[in-house]
């Protein structure tokens, strides 16, 4: 992000956040993506414990209370500071929280913006990661005017590598990070 324009849409997102109302990021045929709110944390905590996505190198904390404290600070600061973050993914038909996906500044990628997605185990294999990924890519381009995004995936995570490929990401490099061999896509 080289320059930053304050437009009416930005001001409306800022107003909603300061009023404690989660900003709706995107809506697809089957999914709603919106900013995470405190009441989402218990459901998300259960999904995070299942594994599958590293939240910007922050491990899942030991207790729900610790996670709640961490996430409430994240909610108060990240969305306001960056105008993006990791968002709650809701299956519209059931109203269930099925995962979390979004954009974050990755210390592992020298502060480049990274796309991440985690769908709960019982909802995997239904195309939800790809569906919310496409919505996030459109939001990143149309709303945030981001010119470059990355995904960082463990080389053994074939499912996530496949999703990234379907989203148009291609191999960029390989690295060893925290002892895990990774493939970086851009």
PLM region spans:
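Acyl-donor (CoA/ACP) binding surface of acyl/acetyltransferases
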Residues: 1-56, 86-186
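Conserved GNAT-fold acetyl-CoA-binding loop/helix
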Residues: 52-73, 84-85
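A generic secondary-structure signal
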Residues: 73-77, 139
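Short loop/turn motifs at secondary-structure junctions and domain boundaries
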Residues: 77-83
């Amino acid at each position: 992000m080289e320059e930053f324009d304050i437009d009416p849409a930005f001001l409306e997102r800022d107003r909603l956040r300061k009023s404690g109302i989660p900003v709706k990021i995107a809506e697809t045929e089957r999914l709603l993506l919106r900013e995470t709110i405190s009441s989402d944390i218990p459901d998300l905590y259960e999904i995070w414990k299942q594994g599958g996505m590293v939240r910007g190198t922050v491990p899942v904390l030991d207790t729900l209370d610790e996670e709640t404290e961490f996430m409430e600070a994240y909610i108060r600061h990240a969305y306001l500071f960056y105008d993006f973050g990791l968002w709650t993914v809701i299956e519209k038909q059931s109203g269930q929280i099925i995962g979390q996906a979004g954009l974050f500044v990755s210390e592992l990628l020298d502060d480049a913006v990274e796309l991440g997605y985690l769908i709960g185990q019982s909802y995997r294999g239904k195309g939800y990661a790809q569906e919310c990924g496409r919505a996030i890519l459109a939001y990143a381009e149309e709303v945030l005017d981001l010119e470059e995004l990355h995904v960082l995936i463990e080389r053994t995570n074939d499912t996530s590598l496949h999703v990234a490929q379907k989203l148009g990401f291609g191999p960029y490099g390989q690295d060893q990070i925290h002892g895990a061999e990774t493939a970086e896509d851009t």
